[in-house]
Amino acid sequence: MIEVMDMRIEVVLLNSLAKRLPGQDPQLGDRLQSGDWTALRGERTAVQLALRWHHEPGVSGNSATVYLQLNGPVALSVSRVMPVPVRLPVYPGHDDNILTSQPGLIPDLLQALKPVEHPAGPAYLLRLTDGQWQVCWLELVVPENLASGRHDFSVILLDGDGERVADAGFDLSVSPASLPPQTLLHTEWFHADCLADYYRVPVRSEAWWQIVGRFMATAAAHGVNLILTPIFTPPLDTAVGGERTTVQLVDVRRDGDAWSFDLTALKRWIDLARENGIPN
């Protein structure tokens, strides 16, 4: 069963490419059908779960608390898809392959959820607002030892007392092949200065190195295998008269006509990247 609706809650499974803007219903072509979700062993893959609660006459309040449980052969991580305010979604001269040209709330941020205790066992707490869709991102890395073929998963929504209020099912088809090692070099912006500024820690402090390492590990988990390294700090994106936090890893010293270069911090950066799964 892909979609279920009782008197209170709608449950719809969507493919991972669907992006639902606030006020929009899930599109028919985005809905997950049996056999749609396929993956190789070792592949990171995901589906989306859309929920909408309808206010019941005679019940006070405009929101409902439900608890999400997932059952299947492997565990799925759960994140809430959060909309973020966007003032300029596209530049002039764009083509038609866009979500919207209007400013507003755009689904972008994945907010990881942790299970909480519940009478029926660990579950993810969700608060639903009357008439509004809330989307969850369900993700896994397919284990190398998972048998090929179809694997069934179930979604169960419970109230605070453990009563089932809605459910749905979906399936994953696993290929007998494994995802080969990544050879494409993939990098993303990695702002080491912003990490220092946001977490309010000094550059090169032990706290800063720990934070950088965690972000490197997260980048590697999402396919980044080449990291931008701040050997020097060029004045990029810096206002005239302003200053951007310096994070260059090469210390340069001039003594008369002689120059010396200390690569200690650069070596630590390279070692840290390799320890966290980024080889380049």
Where are these predicted regions, by residue range?
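Glycine-rich, aromatic-flanked loop segments that form ligand/cofactor-binding clefts
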Residues: 75-117, 183-188, 219-241, 274-280
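Extended acidic/polar, glycine-enriched regions
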Residues: 50-66, 72-73, 122-183, 209
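Short, Lys/Arg-enriched N-terminal segments with co-localized hydrophobic residues
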Residues: 1-6
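An acidic-aromatic substrate-binding cleft motif
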Residues: 165-255, 260, 271-279
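Surface-exposed binding patches on compact interaction domains or structured appendages
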Residues: 7-31, 54-138
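Contiguous beta-strand segments within globular domains
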Residues: 32-56
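Short, polar loop/linker segments at the starts of domains and inter-domain junctions
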Residues: 21-37, 201-208
